[in-house]
């Protein structure tokens, strides 16, 4: 392909042609050309003819843009015909677009006063209050909003407003804590006094395991009624439990202790000591109930609301029969308590129950055990076992004397 050449001796290139920046000899040799016309430095030094070829893309002709481009027309005249009238709100004239009804700007003459003034700025010079803004803030809430820090005078018109410092009063926190404690105690006493209810235990917790055993034993010890009852009684203040409720509560406690002792995981000496105290409390409850029941001589205090007071029944046959009935019921429960004492004695003799001297040749796992490092003293368990058997013999002898 031949390109039109322009030498140094020729005139300026014809209109519409553009010459290359590099001459032909420099372009073929791929050497940077000095781009000097009519002859570059390399061609002038070698005394060669310097020729510049025309570029492959000729320049645009002058005046072509003016003839090719159409005359622009206003876009506002073509929009209604070019696009369908699906959204007339955006295509119509802004003056014809319907606006939502709003209050005119003149209805808020005091909104941000002096904000466009140059001389002074009242928003900075004076503090901002609710009087400065004439906007109806109360329409956003169901009840009026009181801001005492902004306007103290408006607080007198709100009789139902509660001061914030009233919530931090120490007496209120004490009342809330007392009410919570009373509700918890009422629930515990109602569940313990119900004969139809089973042994007290958490509903979702398993009935086995040392930790669960401790929790269950402590719950039974806390929920068991106190065996001692004051002689002065006010019927309107503290109603006494009946003998039936006390017998049912003790029976449930004995059944729960039996379930825990029959589990092989309850070999912990501390847990056995707690169960021993539970049995002692049950025996004390039986003894107190037996001694406060009116006997043939009219002594004692009536626990059961169905029996007449001691002053009215005296040494009648009804009082003697009631005392014998209570004694027979307690005697029917003592054989279960005696069985628990026998099981406890066997558990006291196992390695986990009694204290023993740590062996120096034992492994690290045995020495790290709490029962090995800090065991329950054997003398304490022996005293507990002797006390249980003594209380059981004493109570049995009293019942036999009543039934003779």
Curated annotation (Swiss-Prot):
PROSITE patterns noted in UniProt: ZN2_CY6_FUNGAL_1, ZN2_CY6_FUNGAL_2
Lineage: superkingdom: Eukaryota
Compositionally biased residues, Polar residues: 74-83
- Tell me where it resides: Nucleus
Query: What coarse category fits the chief subcellular location reported for this protein?
Result: nucleus
Q: Where is this chain compositionally biased, Low complexity type?
A: 188-197
One Pfam family per UniProt = AflR
Q: Which CDD domains match?
A: GAL4 (cd00067)
Care to name a GO molecular-function term for this sequence? DNA-binding transcription factor activity, RNA polymerase II-specific
Which PANTHER family did the record assign?
MONODICTYPHENONE CLUSTER TRANSCRIPTION FACTOR-RELATED, OLEATE-ACTIVATED TRANSCRIPTION FACTOR 1-RELATED
Q: What name goes with this protein? A: Agnestins biosynthesis cluster transcription factor AgnL10
Which organism was this protein described from?
Answer: Paecilomyces divaricatus
